């Protein structure tokens, strides 16, 4: 696990923002497909996704081992540059109040001839959720990188557990 790929947790009152930057040795179009195609998402993000890919469209995800149900409106759909959407999570035993205001922004920046810089911002999360999700999202991004590289995907739980130390403050 590489500490240089650690994200940032920015606390502002009762809310927080998670920020990650990953350099990926793949064209934006490949990364775009991996973050917007339900078949691709199912492999690395461990979710069932329905995406109405357009400005004003919707997302409907059932995510990860916990089975969080998330819906939202697509705020920006600009292939292969920006995918921004609401992240409204229904109440769940691990999130009793759910999340009603969160937004995820995936920004893909061309890096040289064939690489991509992925800037991921997960904003307007409640502070407890952000602290809980930081290492999990780190683990999912490691899985995204492995999928793009055609490597065996790392075990999410092991990666999540190993990344927890990066986000404890």
Give residue ranges: language-model regions.
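Hydrophobic pocket/interface hotspot
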Residues: 31, 41, 59, 74, ...
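Hydrophobic ligand-binding cavity/cleft-lining segments
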Residues: 1-48
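Tryptophan-centric aromatic hotspots in well-structured domains and transmembrane helices
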Residues: 32-35, 44, 77, 86-89, ...
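A short, structured loop/turn motif at beta-sheet edges
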Residues: 28, 75-81, 107-117
